[in-house]
Each structure stands twice: as C-alpha cells, then as structure tokens.
C-alpha cells in the first residue's frame, strides 16, 4: 500500500475525467483502493426501497468514489493545484505545498 498525500477534509480539484475542473472537499479516502469520495463530484443515482428511515423510497443522488490520481490538492495560499511534499519539522512529519512551500 502506498503513502497517500491526500487526506479527508482537504479541498481538491478534479484534473481528469468527466468532472474535470470540479472542486470539492474530500469526505473519505479508501487507501486500499486508491480512491476518494469528493463532495459534489461523481454523483450517481441509487434506487432505494422504502424503509423506516425513508418511507417514500425512490431515487437518491449520492457521491461515488474517484481515483486519487484524478484529483489534485488546492494550495490554500495561491488557490491553484499543487503537488504535496512531506518533510520533518522537529520530530513530526508535515505535509507542505510544493508551489508555496506552506505547511498544509
């Protein structure tokens, strides 16, 4: 399993695929599958049966996962996509933006 540089809560932009250019917050990262769920991106229709929680049932829009390689982190300082580096500060590893050299 490789070390992923994108975490839940990061703001990312889709750089490839049908939703290219869309931005959103990472809701969940699946490390074993190299996929992530991004808020408002890659919406799919799920058909749900009536239940106690949803007595009506019907069709519900829900986010599906997207490949990690198709998203890039947005630098909070420059608001552009950036690559992520890891360096040691003191005795902790921290992520930093390669464009602005700012700790994320």
Swiss-Prot record:
Transmembrane parts of this sequence: none
Domain of life assignment: Bacteria
Ribosomal protein among keywords: yes
InterPro entries: KOW (IPR005824), Rib_uL2_dom2 (IPR014722), Ribosomal_uL24 (IPR003256), Ribosomal_uL24_CS (IPR005825), Ribosomal_uL24_KOW (IPR041988), Translation_prot_SH3-like_sf (IPR008991)
GO biological process: translation
Pfam families in alphabetical order: KOW (PF00467), ribosomal_L24 (PF17136)
SUPFAM superfamilies: Translation proteins SH3-like domain
Family matches, as SMART domains: KOW
Keyword terms, alphabetized: Ribonucleoprotein, Ribosomal protein, RNA-binding, rRNA-binding
GO MF annotation list: rRNA binding; structural constituent of ribosome
GO CC annotations, alphabetized: ribonucleoprotein complex; ribosome
Keyword hit for rRNA-binding: yes
Family designation: Belongs to the universal ribosomal protein uL24 family.
PANTHER family recorded: MITOCHONDRIAL RIBOSOMAL PROTEIN L24
Physiological role: One of two assembly initiator proteins, it binds directly to the 5'-end of the 23S rRNA, where it nucleates assembly of the 50S subunit.
Subunit organization: Part of the 50S ribosomal subunit.
Record-given protein name: Large ribosomal subunit protein uL24
Protein's organism: Flavobacterium johnsoniae (strain ATCC 17061 / DSM 2064 / JCM 8514 / BCRC 14874 / CCUG 350202 / NBRC 14942 / NCIMB 11054 / UW101) (Cytophaga johnsonae)
Taxonomic lineage from the root: Bacteria, Pseudomonadati, Bacteroidota, Flavobacteriia, Flavobacteriales
Gene: rplX
């Amino acid at each position: 399993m490789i070390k992923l540089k994108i975490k839940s809560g990061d703001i990312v932009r889709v750089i490839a695929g049908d939703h290219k250019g869309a931005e959103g917050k990472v809701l969940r990262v699946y490390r074993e599958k190299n996929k992530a769920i991004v808020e408002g991106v890659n919406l799919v229709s799920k058909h749900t049966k009536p239940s106690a929680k949803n007595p009506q049932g019907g069709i519900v829009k829900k986010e599906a996962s997207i490949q990690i390689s198709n998203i890039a982190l947005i630098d909070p300082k420059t608001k552009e996509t950036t690559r992520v580096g890891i360096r040691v500060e003191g005795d902790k590893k921290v992520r930093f933006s390669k464009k602005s050299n700012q700790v994320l």
